[in-house]
UniProtKB/Swiss-Prot annotation:
It is a single-pass membrane protein. The lineage of its organism: Eukaryota, Viridiplantae, Streptophyta, Embryophyta, Tracheophyta. This is Cytochrome b6-f complex subunit 5. The chain crosses the membrane at residues 5-25. SUPFAM superfamilies: PetG subunit of the cytochrome b6f complex. It is found in: Plastid, Chloroplast thylakoid membrane.
Amino acid sequence: MVEALLSGIVLGLIPITLAGLFVTAYLQYRRGDQLDIR
């Protein structure tokens, strides 16, 4: 029962973590593009 709960939590957190990393990288890319660095 504990294994099922942990696997459910992990499967739920993985997409959220990937989405958060993607959004953060995208915002940093947009910010750098707006500042026109290099």
